[in-house]
């Protein structure tokens, strides 16, 4: 009965306005009130502030600053084996496994379309048919920055407008095509393990989705698909990120979906649905053996990232996708 009521609210409540209100409130400096809200949040969700670079809640001017708080480097060591891809986020694995042609498992008895997840981009979908996927849910208590599973060269980013359903166990089991319906940012990378997609999925109360190379992607919420592309390799304007490096963040949190090409990686055997994830721990292993890591690409300076973002053309029409 209670679950039915909660599901009904998902369809009745004005999720967009609630999200805008939450984003507005979380960005405001309210002095003692901000600290009180943070303290209550920490207590209710049992947030481990000892891991944060700034463990004192009084040091955060806004709730958003607290929510995207950086962690101390030593609390998330990155596995250095060149054959290992690491977990991109703190959270819990919702589902994982093989992509069956165009079908991805959402919950027991519920699948959704790979092509729909990728906003109808069938060429991108072809890269991952019969490949591997991992869906990681970030709860409110988790660290909400997202990191790279491996070295990667950014090739494409697509913003897809959509619904703002909550993303949790209840909605995954009961809202059809949940991840293909919600707002999301799709990031496609070239890696030594083949193409990899890392998808940041929005939800109710997720105030914004950001990337390190382009800043805030949403809001504003304009209701149109947007697409950006970047050059390959070491060409001028390329964006290179290292294994374990931050690539994005949620202000209030949601879900990360990783897609890997067929035959390129095997997921770590002990991982299963509801496994706890920590950034830097093994997620998958290459099906090939790398004796030594390839030369690591140098991270792009911040000013060049900003310049590239300003120069990248926007394509606002769905039909212009490749």
From Swiss-Prot:
It is an enzyme of class 4 (lyase). Is synthesized initially as an inactive proenzyme. Formation of the active enzyme involves a self-maturation process in which the active site pyruvoyl group is generated from an internal serine residue via an autocatalytic post-translational modification. Two non-identical subunits are generated from the proenzyme in this reaction, and the pyruvate is formed at the N-terminus of the alpha chain, which is derived from the carboxyl end of the proenzyme. The keyword Lyase applies. The record marks 253-254 as: Cleavage (non-hydrolytic). The keyword Lipid biosynthesis applies. Residues 308-322 have a biased composition (Basic and acidic residues). One of its GO terms (biological process) is phosphatidylethanolamine biosynthetic process. One of its GO terms (cellular component) is plasma membrane. Its EC number is 4.1.1.65. Keywords: Cell membrane, Decarboxylase, Lipid biosynthesis, Lipid metabolism, Lyase, Membrane, Phospholipid biosynthesis, Phospholipid metabolism, Pyruvate, Zymogen. It is a peripheral membrane protein. Pfam families: PS_Dcarbxylase. Binds 1 pyruvoyl group covalently per subunit. Heterodimer of a large membrane-associated beta subunit and a small pyruvoyl-containing alpha subunit. Catalyzes the formation of phosphatidylethanolamine (PtdEtn) from phosphatidylserine (PtdSer). This is Phosphatidylserine decarboxylase proenzyme.
């Amino acid at each position: 009965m209670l679950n039915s009521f909660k599901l009904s609210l998902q369809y009745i409540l004005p999720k967009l306005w609630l999200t805008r209100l939450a984003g507005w409130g979380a960005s405001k400096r309210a002095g003692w009130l901000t600290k009180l809200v943070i303290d209550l949040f920490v207590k209710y969700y049992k947030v481990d502030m000892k891991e944060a670079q700034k463990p004192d809640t009084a040091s955060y001017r806004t709730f958003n600053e607290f929510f995207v708080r950086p962690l101390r480097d030593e609390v998330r060591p990155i596995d250095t084996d060149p054959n290992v891809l690491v977990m991109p986020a703190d959270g819990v694995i919702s589902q994982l496994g093989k992509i069956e042609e165009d079908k991805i498992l959402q919950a027991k008895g519920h699948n959704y379309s790979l092509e729909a997840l990728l906003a109808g981009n069938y060429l991108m979908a072809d890269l991952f048919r019969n490949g591997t996927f991992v869906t990681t849910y970030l709860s409110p208590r988790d660290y909400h920055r997202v990191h790279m599973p491996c070295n990667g060269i950014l090739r494409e980013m697509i913003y897809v407008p959509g619904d703002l359903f909550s993303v949790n166990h209840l909605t995954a089991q009961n809202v059809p095509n949940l991840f293909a319906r919600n707002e999301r940012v799709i990031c496609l990378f070239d890696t030594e393990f083949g193409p990899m997609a890392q998808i940041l999925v929005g939800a109710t109360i997720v105030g914004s989705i950001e990337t390190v190379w382009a800043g805030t992607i949403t809001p504003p919420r304009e209701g149109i698909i947007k697409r950006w592309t970047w050059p390959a390799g070491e060409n001028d304007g390329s964006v290179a990120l290292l294994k374990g490096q931050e690539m994005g963040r949620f202000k209030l949190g949601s879900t990360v979906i990783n897609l890997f090409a067929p035959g390129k990686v095997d997921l770590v055997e002990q991982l299963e649905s509801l496994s706890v994830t920590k950034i830097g721990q093994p997620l998958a292993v290459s099906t090939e053996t790398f004796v030594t890591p390839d030369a690591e690409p140098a991270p792009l300076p911040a000013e060049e990232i900003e310049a590239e973002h300003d120069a990248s053309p926007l394509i606002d029409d769905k039909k212009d996708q490749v």
